[in-house]
Amino acid sequence: MAEAVAYLNNRRVSVAWNGERLVTGRADGPLEFDGEGSLLVWDLRGILKNRPAPGPLPLNPKRETLVDSGMAWGEDVIDAIMADRGTVIVPLRSLRGWGELDEALVYAELELVSLDWVGEPVAAHADFQGDIVELLRQLLRRNIPRVMVNSLDGSFPFIPAGLAGSVRLDVAMLTDGHPPNWAGEVFRLG
């Protein structure tokens, strides 16, 4: 299991799904990224505002760091990249449809897109709601090699084996449980 942290105002915080939206809990302590292996970082200030709020992170250059800063517009990917805080995750949760994802692809060759899951995709735009298989196919058509499925309630989508072998599927979990067999790297937030 890989390490994952959520932070708000330079403090580690707990995060949970209340059935409608992400909510933050107590501030646990200062933000430190010591250790080894991959690290998933949820910048809750950016996620809650739907716009990257770039600021310095005390990153460890020896670790692969994946950063979800939140964004609603394709051009927001520029701010996230320029912050140079690790691999940029483009979240579909608040992006304004395929057009905005395509705009982000104009600015950068994206390595990683995330999809929030609560028995079905959770997204503000109808383009990203519905059949998970079709969503993954659309991402493959756009040459996106890696997708992070954020399981907000402990449930996971059914991914056919043929499709699971075509794209790297990682998982971020907010609750305890066992990841699906198609999961690549598994991160636990909490």
Predicted regions and their residues:
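A cross-family glycoside hydrolase active-site/sugar-binding cleft signature
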Residues: 5-7, 42, 66-70, 91, ...
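Short, conserved loop/helix-junction motifs that constitute active-site signature segments
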Residues: 105-107
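Glycine-rich phosphate-binding active-site loops on the catalytic face of alpha/beta enzymes
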Residues: 76-101, 148-154, 167-190
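Short amphipathic alpha-helical segments
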Residues: 53, 101-102
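Conserved N-terminal beta1-alpha1 strand-loop-helix module at the mouth
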Residues: 1-63, 72-82, 109-113, 119-148, ...
